[in-house]
Amino acid sequence: MIALIQRVSQAKVDVKGETIGKIGKGLLVLLGVEKEDNREKADKLAEKVLNYRIFSDENDKMNLNVQQAQGELLIVSQFTLAADTQKGLRPSFSKGASPALANELYEYFIQKCAEKLPVSTGQFAADMQVSLTNDGPVTFWLNV
């Protein structure tokens, strides 16, 4: 399971011209689910996202997690994170989870995160437009 996290000052996701999820300060989490993923991996990744220290403390050092920074999460499903790009000029999605498994683990991941923080979401399998202001920029690839 993969999370591409970006520290943002604001982010939103639109579907068919309508904003369905919006946050202020926090993390935009682009979530990719792979074939071998399960709830245990989702638990580990949620814990890592919630506790990863990428917000500045009073000394301007990355020392606070999103909870300590009183931030929010915008979680968006992104199957392309599971792409194999090692060969050729076209990505292969053979490592990606089936839509049923991906949706189940996406919803489970959202539920786990929502136990700790305000969460907004995208729409699974929809064509979405994601807008953000990356603060830093600060972006990390987390894989469990």
Curated annotation (Swiss-Prot):
Keyword Cytoplasm annotated: yes
Organism: Haemophilus influenzae (strain ATCC 51907 / DSM 11121 / KW20 / Rd)
Record text about domains: A Gly-cisPro motif from one monomer fits into the active site of the other monomer to allow specific chiral rejection of L-amino acids.
GO molecular function: D-tyrosyl-tRNA(Tyr) deacylase activity; Gly-tRNA(Ala) deacylase activity; Ser(Gly)-tRNA(Ala) hydrolase activity; tRNA binding
NCBIfam families, sorted: D-aminoacyl-tRNA deacylase
InterPro entries registered for this protein in UniProt: Daa-tRNA_deacyls_DTD (IPR003732), DTD-like_sf (IPR023509)
Motif Gly-cisPro motif, important for rejection of L-amino acids per record, residues: 136-137
Lineage summary: Bacteria, Pseudomonadati, Pseudomonadota, Gammaproteobacteria, Pasteurellales
GO cellular component entries: cytoplasm
Summary of the function given for this chain in its UniProt record: An aminoacyl-tRNA editing enzyme that deacylates mischarged D-aminoacyl-tRNAs. Also deacylates mischarged glycyl-tRNA(Ala), protecting cells against glycine mischarging by AlaRS. Acts via tRNA-based rather than protein-based catalysis; rejects L-amino acids rather than detecting D-amino acids in the active site. By recycling D-aminoacyl-tRNA to D-amino acids and free tRNA molecules, this enzyme counteracts the toxicity associated with the formation of D-aminoacyl-tRNA entities in vivo and helps enforce protein L-homochirality.
Family: Belongs to the DTD family.
Protein name: D-aminoacyl-tRNA deacylase
